[in-house]
Amino acid sequence: MIKENNKKCVVIGAGISGIGAAIRMRNKGYQVTVFEANSFPGGKLSTETKNGYRFDMGPSVFTFPEYVDELFILSGKSPRNYFNYEHLDPVYQYFFEDGSVLDAFHNKEQFAEGMAAKTIDSKEDIIHYLNKTENIYSLTASVFLHNSLHKIRNYFTKRVAKGLWNFGKIGAFDTMNSANEKAFKDPRLVQIANRYATYNGSSPYLSPGTLNVIPYVEIVKGAFYPKGGMYSITESLVKLAKDIGVQFNFSTP
């Protein structure tokens, strides 16, 4: 039950972040209105229909579904009544010009065994690489993922101190490509690891090795398929927001 406080809140933009912020503010009792310049919600996570076919626009990989579920739970709703997804395994299949196909399974052991069977790298070397990326995640997640960067107090915690103390272990002084070439002998594995730089429009030859945390997130923590496509994330969150009283105004630049 939302405890009303009669205060008003305006959110600019009905992208996923804007919708999420609106849901959180509504749960704090604010009367929330969202203004969006476009005629549709979602921002980058939108959709387009042509000739009877619908295409998801923008993001194509879904990780950390628990952060979406969190908004429903916060609102006292069952996530599965709004939004469903399934686990992808294998996460990817990679097709190369030489005709070879490499499967990226969700599971550290399976991934390493599968890749070792089809490349010149050993299972042990691949496991070692994934363990290094896991270490990067453990040192950086609490700073960049689990807490707000806009609150000064979040910088004065034991976890942040641990991250700073181990700064040299997160690959910040290496490029992604350099770190990946040191880790793998097979150029296909280097290529697979390097491609994660494209997620934020970066180059693996310029980006810090810290971004090698992304393979860990997808391979070990998992990637998922939202039933109904990626746009179902937007649709479900908009429905939740409306159900708890958030007002939307579209085409209002």
Functional labels for PLM-detected ranges:
Residues 2-139:
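N-terminal glycine-rich phosphate/pyrophosphate-binding loop and immediately adjacent elements
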Residues 14, 20, 67, 110, ...:
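Generic recognition of stable, solvent-exposed alpha-helical segments in well-folded globular domains
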Residues 19, 24, 28, 179-183, ...:
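Generic, well-ordered alpha-helical scaffold segments in large soluble proteins
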Residues 56-59, 205, 224-228:
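Alpha-helix capping and helix-loop boundary segments enriched in small/acidic/polar residues
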Residues 81, 204-205, 240:
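Active-site substrate-recognition segment that forms the wall
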Residues 97-206:
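Rossmann-like flavin
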Residues 206-214:
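Active-site-proximal loop/short-helix segments
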Residues 213-253:
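Helical element adjacent to the flavin cofactor pocket in flavoenzyme catalytic cores
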